[in-house]
């Protein structure tokens, strides 16, 4: 997981947010 990844956060916010 990472800021520029859409693993967990990317599902909710986007690929980089």
Curated annotation (Swiss-Prot):
Biological process terms in GO annotation: neuropeptide signaling pathway
Main location: secreted
Keywords assigned by UniProt, alphabetized: Amidation, Neuropeptide, Secreted
GO cellular-component term (any): extracellular region
Domain of life per record: Eukaryota
Transmembrane annotation, as ranges: none
Subcellular location as annotated: Secreted
Keyword Secreted set for record: yes
Residues recorded as bearing Leucine amide in the entry: 17
GO molecular function terms noted in the UniProt entry: neuropeptide hormone activity
Tissue: Expressed in abdominal perisympathetic organs and abdominal ganglia.
Functional summary from the UniProt entry: Myoactive.
Family stated for the protein in its record: Belongs to the pyrokinin family.
Protein name (record): Pyrokinin-5a
Organism, scientific name: Blaptica dubia
């Amino acid at each position: 997981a990472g800021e520029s990844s859409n693993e967990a956060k990317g599902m909710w916010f986007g690929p980089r947010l």
